[in-house]
């Protein structure tokens, strides 16, 4: 947390700490109670402000002026005792904030968040791993957030094990986003996702683990028209989507730049067929390890004989435990 005034201090357990230098407030030992925060209107950097806090509750923040704050990364992260946060967090002026990465990350006792739906996110560029709280039962309505300048939302909901619904983020502007890695990964109790079919994915390079570990997911939105022309990795994309019975038509995806497809459909145990991915360009793919492993209800696969996997180096166990697959294709790689 950084500011530029000699009048800024934090009072913890009746002792004042000067905030004129960059400090991690979590370094102040045995903080149980923040009594007051003076000079909060001078602060520009609130990163790590309550990181790994031992407090059970935060002070009233009605008087906080966040209008100059540009950095909120890790602000509440890894604070194991927070079960809730003050409702008036919703009133923070976030109009100049550019970084919200890991904001509530691993606050594993949080059951809910205040209504942050009206936060001004117009300047935010990084929202990666923003939530990642395994006991959160619900999230505020963040459907109207301005994401037009965001470049990274990777892992934003990663590991939110207790969520049964996600906010409707279907209309988010992700035109500048480059990574969707782990975005919904291990949201184990989600059955349906927002309709993300119309997302502008023209700048996405990484969709690794996007739907990884969604064990109860019953359907994938129609992502058949996604622009995948810049994507280089699809590692573990649908891995462990054990309840899925079908996938969208992926035949028109441009995979010409993809280098990694390992674990892509691994343990999609209820799939009975695959999309026609035999038309994919795999000329740059180097890794297909365990790509279809554990797809135990698939009895046939597309004709992969036309695949030209000239750079393929790793293809271990591609069709292992595909119990109903009588004839297992031999995908030829670089050494074949």
Residue ranges and their predicted role:
Residues 1-336:
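Negatively charged
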């Amino acid at each position: 947390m950084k500011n530029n005034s000699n009048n800024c201090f934090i009072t913890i357990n009746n002792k004042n700490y000067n905030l004129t230098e960059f400090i991690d407030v979590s370094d102040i030992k045995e903080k149980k109670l923040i009594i007051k925060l003076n000079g909060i209107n001078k602060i520009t950097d609130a990163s790590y402000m309550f990181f790994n806090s031992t407090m059970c509750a935060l002070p009233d923040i009605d008087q906080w002026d966040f209008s100059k704050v540009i950095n909120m990364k890790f602000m509440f992260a890894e604070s194991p005792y927070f079960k809730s946060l003050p409702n008036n967090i919703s009133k923070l002026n976030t109009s100049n904030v550019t970084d919200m990465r890991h904001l509530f990350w691993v606050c594993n006792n949080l059951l809910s968040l205040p209504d942050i739906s009206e936060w001004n996110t117009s300047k935010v560029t990084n929202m990666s791993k923003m939530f990642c709280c395994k006991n959160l039962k619900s999230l505020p309505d963040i459907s109207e957030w301005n994401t037009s300048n965001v470049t990274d939302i990777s892992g934003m909901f990663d590991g939110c094990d207790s969520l049964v619904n996600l906010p409707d983020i279907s209309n988010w502007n992700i035109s500048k986003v480059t990574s969707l890695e782990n975005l919904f990964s291990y949201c184990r109790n989600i059955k349906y996702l927002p309709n993300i079919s119309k997302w502008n994915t023209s700048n996405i390079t990484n969709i690794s683990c996007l739907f990884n570990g969604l064990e109860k997911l019953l359907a994938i939105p129609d992502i058949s028209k996604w622009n995948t022309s810049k994507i280089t990795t699809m590692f573990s994309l649908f891995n462990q989507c054990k309840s899925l019975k079908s996938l969208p038509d992926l035949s028109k995806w441009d995979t010409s730049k993809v280098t990694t497809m390992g674990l892509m459909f691994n343990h999609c145990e209820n799939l009975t067929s695959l999309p026609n991915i035999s038309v994919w360009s795999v000329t740059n793919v180097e890794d297909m390890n365990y790509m279809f492993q554990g797809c135990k209800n698939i009895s046939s696969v597309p004709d992969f004989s036309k695949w030209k996997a000239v750079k393929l180096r790793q293809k271990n166990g591609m069709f292992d435990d595909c119990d109903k697959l009588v004839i297992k294709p031999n995908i030829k790689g670089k050494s074949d």
